[in-house]
Swiss-Prot record:
Protein name (Swiss-Prot/TrEMBL): Ribosomal RNA small subunit methyltransferase G
Top EC class, one word: transferase
Family under the similarity heading: Belongs to the methyltransferase superfamily. RNA methyltransferase RsmG family.
UniProt source species: Mycobacterium leprae (strain Br4923)
Major location category of this protein: cytoplasm
Length: 248
């Protein structure tokens, strides 16, 4: 899906010193250019903001400064392989903007909404979006709140990274998706155990066709594992209103 666009020399890429992470330099060179192309300068500015303001405000730990490219930006942006042109994407529990902002940088055709409940994170996200000049909406709220769906509409894709277990992610994501929309959850090495543990709850919430896919296998030393599932055509649950109580 990505096209390599040569926007500078090898030496110019080397000037982006924070690119050098746990991956081999040649691998980073290929991955960065393949994913970000002519928007590499925007990605670098985002990395700088994460390394400074993001860490200062506690959105990331200080030990993350030397692995922002491989662990965070590339890890997030490769999910774009699974997205269609013009997809309407919601990043649930966006935090410091991961994976939503790397996706928006790599794929400006996407319509990205960052959904985050905490004010300090929302403030950071809005500052970053303004600084980078991105066409991205930041919404302060929780996925389970009814007004959130009214605000952002039905999305094609709900993405998340290190937010919650699959049962909760499914509960939060389904109401924000159009029928047939996709949930893309970046997960770790215990992904199959997690699916086995939560598959019945996921199905009861309307998730169908649960599968595990790998992104970035051609150019990342550690490809990214993603749980992909769809919102069923018939079973769709609306989020609860804030303050509503169940009646017996």
């Amino acid at each position: 899906m990505f096209h390599v666009k040569h926007v500078g020399s090898y030496e110019e890429l080397a000037s982006f010193t924070s690119v050098k992470g746990n991956l081999g330099f040649d691998t980073v060179f290929e991955a960065v250019f393949m994913i970000f192309g002519p928007r590499l300068n925007i990605a670098q500015r985002y990395v700088d903001l994460l390394a400074n303001t993001g860490i200062e405000r506690g959105l990331l730990g200080p030990h993350e400064a030397n692995r922002l490219w491989d662990r965070h930006l590339l890890n997030s942006a490769v999910v774009a392989e699974l997205l269609d042109p013009g997809d309407r994407v919601v990043d649930i529990g966006s935090g410091a903007g991961l994976p939503g902002l790397p996706l928006a940088i790599a794929r400006p055709d996407l319509q990205v909404v960052l959904l985050e409940p905490l004010l300090r994170r929302v403030t950071f996200l809005r500052e970053v979006v303004a600084e980078l000049g991105l066409d991205v909406e930041v919404v302060r709220g929780r996925a389970e709140e009814l007004w959130v769906r009214d605000r952002i509409g039905e999305r094609d894709v709900a993405v998340s990274r290190a937010v919650a277990a699959l049962d909760k992610l499914t509960k939060w994501s389904i109401p924000l998706l159009r029928p047939g929309g996709q949930i893309l959850a970046i997960k770790g090495e215990h992904v199959f155990d997690e699916i086995h543990q939560h598959r019945r709850v996921m199905a009861s919430l309307g998730a169908v066709d649960v599968m595990v896919v790998v992104c970035g296998a051609n150019y990342l030393c550690r490809p990214v594992t993603v749980v992909l599932t769809r919102c069923g055509q018939q079973m769709r649950h609306k989020p609860a209103r804030v303050g509503d109580r169940k009646t017996q």
